[in-house]
Amino acid sequence: MTYYGVLFVEKCTPSTITQLQDVLSTDLISMGDKWSFELKTFRTSAKNTDPNDTKVMHTVQLSHKNNETVTIKNQSAIITPTYVTKALYDNGCVFGTPEPFDYMLSNKLSNIWTQRQSIKGEFGVSYQTADLSIRVNNAFSYSGFQGLILELESKSSDNLEAFEKNVERVRTMLSGMGLSDVRVSSDKSQGSKQEDSSLFDLAAHYLKVLG
């Protein structure tokens, strides 16, 4: 199965991404497609809600995961796809393509949900090494540069122990660059996963290091 981890480096500059590429060049097999991500935070303005119910909701969208939106609230998550099945078209149930869920929150449900924050990265770089797929991106918010994001993806043949060693190796590499202030969130359990479950976990990793 495939394991994921997300690392966030705060005390760095936008040019750190170039320095990282130089360090990775010794292990680099190939470079992949550009990619982007966005984490949005919403807060409800609805009255008379359950006092035990959190007023905050997050959405995570990753371009390399079909731009599907993962919505996280109360430690539960759903995926809203950006496609419609052929059967729904054939039945005349829908026309056109669905709007992203976070777009509906911001534009059609703005009387209930107010967007409070957006952290995103565009034109990220993907690297393939012998052991990992590594996606790197600069993270920005409304106030400017926030830090460097690294998404790690194991080979499907790796076990959890091998992946954890590779995560630690990347942390050591960052430390060698003078980057020791690193937040890390990665898969910790071993066993078969459904594709949706992997995307839920990956979105949760982004939220943990950026939230």
From Swiss-Prot:
InterPro entries in the cross-refs: Med20, Mediator_Med20
GO CC terms in record: mediator complex
Location(s), subcellular: Nucleus
Recorded superkingdom: Eukaryota
Pfam families for the chain: Med20
GO biological process, one term: regulation of transcription by RNA polymerase II
GO molecular function list: transcription coregulator activity
Keyword tags: Activator, Nucleus, Transcription, Transcription regulation
Assembly with partners or alone: Component of the Mediator complex.
Family: Belongs to the Mediator complex subunit 20 family.
Described purpose of this protein according to its UniProt entry: Component of the Mediator complex, a coactivator involved in the regulated transcription of nearly all RNA polymerase II-dependent genes. Mediator functions as a bridge to convey information from gene-specific regulatory proteins to the basal RNA polymerase II transcription machinery. Mediator is recruited to promoters by direct interactions with regulatory proteins and serves as a scaffold for the assembly of a functional preinitiation complex with RNA polymerase II and the general transcription factors.
Protein name, entry field: Mediator of RNA polymerase II transcription subunit 20
Organism from which the protein derives: Kluyveromyces lactis (strain ATCC 8585 / CBS 2359 / DSM 70799 / NBRC 1267 / NRRL Y-1140 / WM37)
